């Protein structure tokens, strides 16, 4: 278990954790294909884009903040203005899944939040396994925000003998990677997070797939090969930094895609 972290390390862990939360919604959507589905959208749920899924996750966070402020209702316009979103896009995204607004009132914050959690598959606790007990894996394991959003970090896995049998600061146990298949089956792990070096990522993802996990969040650079029924989302921090670098260099022409 690592020692004390610097302020920069804490900030990095927080930013990585935010990226983790932002991407999990699409993985939950993939998991729902083989399990219990949320309320049916007006069209085939398999055709919902990843950008739409990500926006629903953003709306959910905004509603959570509004609820904490004591708000009971909100219009798409006020939601957009307060959180720097697009009102027309909000209405379009929500209309895809049904009619949630009330004429003259807008949206009931608590009800819309509940519907979004159902749509995103977050109305039940999901168990997550982290592969790789290095600094990144440990930082993710100890982030308390995951549990608040319904994601339980069930275990970590590593192949270094000195780490096996240890725990993260928050008490997440570290198991031998050889026990992955047995643990996934016994503890119903739904999502795997890869926090391993790029050189071993494909070998590790093969083990994860063989264990029966259908949703994977990959923090290793590069592209992984998986079967068609397995969803992988990559979080490449270097790409994000390069995008910010482009914005700084060309701020007058840089535009957000979504």
Predicted regions and their residues:
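Extreme N-terminal segment that seeds HTH/winged-HTH DNA-binding domains in transcriptional regulators
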Residues: 15-72
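HTH-adjacent hinge/linker in prokaryotic transcriptional regulators
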Residues: 73, 77, 82-127
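Glycine-rich Rossmann-fold phosphate-binding loop(s) that bind the pyrophosphate
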Residues: 133
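Phosphate-bearing ligand-interacting subdomains
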Residues: 62-67, 170-258
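NAD(P)-binding Rossmann-fold cofactor-contacting core
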Residues: 149-170
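Extreme N-terminal basic, low-complexity initiation segments
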Residues: 2-12
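Hydrophobic/small residue at the entry helix of a nucleotide-binding pocket
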Residues: 136
